[in-house]
A protein has these predicted regions:
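C-terminal output helix
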Residues: 89, 107-116
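Two-component/phosphorelay signaling modules centered on CheY-like receiver
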Residues: 13-32
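Receiver (REC) domain active-site loop signature in two-component systems and cognate sites
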Residues: 58
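Active-site beta3 strand of CheY-like receiver
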Residues: 47-53
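Short, conserved "switch-loop" micro-motifs in signal-transduction and mechanochemical regulators
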Residues: 85-86
Length: 123
């Protein structure tokens, strides 16, 4: 596939690996990684990836804070929440801050594929 950059932000190394493996099966393999919300913000500003997957509960800055700052920097940023935990309030706040979608962990490859197709269809 085309060489699009995808940022994966999760404090769990295993979760990042699982998401990368699922995305690779969809034909994409150019990844940036972050282990907390602040790293996600910094990485986004430096590399401007086309798609961001972010967990909600993380150290330093959580996913909601990361989404807010990323979207403040780039209102067109395409951010997807991927989380197994998080309160309804946190999920609502993530959507209000500009998250485009939510995927529940554990996720299926088809769910990841649907998100990626929706993002890049027609490019």
């Amino acid at each position: 596939m085309e060489n699009v950059k995808i940022l994966i932000c999760d404090d769990s190394i295993l979760a990042r690996k699982q998401l990368k493996d699922a995305i690779k099966k969809c034909g994409y393999d150019n990844f940036l990684e972050a282990s907390n919300g602040q790293e996600a913000i910094d990485t986004y500003k430096e590399h401007k990836p086309e798609l961001v997957f972010v967990d909600i509960v993380m150290p330093i800055k959580d996913g909601v804070e990361a989404i807010h700052e990323i979207r403040e920097f780039d209102p067109t940023a395409h951010v997807i929440v991927v989380s197994s935990v998080g309160t309804q309030t946190q999920l609502k706040n993530a959507i209000m801050e500009g998250a485009r979608d939510f995927i529940q962990k554990p996720f299926s490859i088809s769910a990841i594929n649907d998100i990626i197709r929706a993002r890049f269809e027609g490019r």
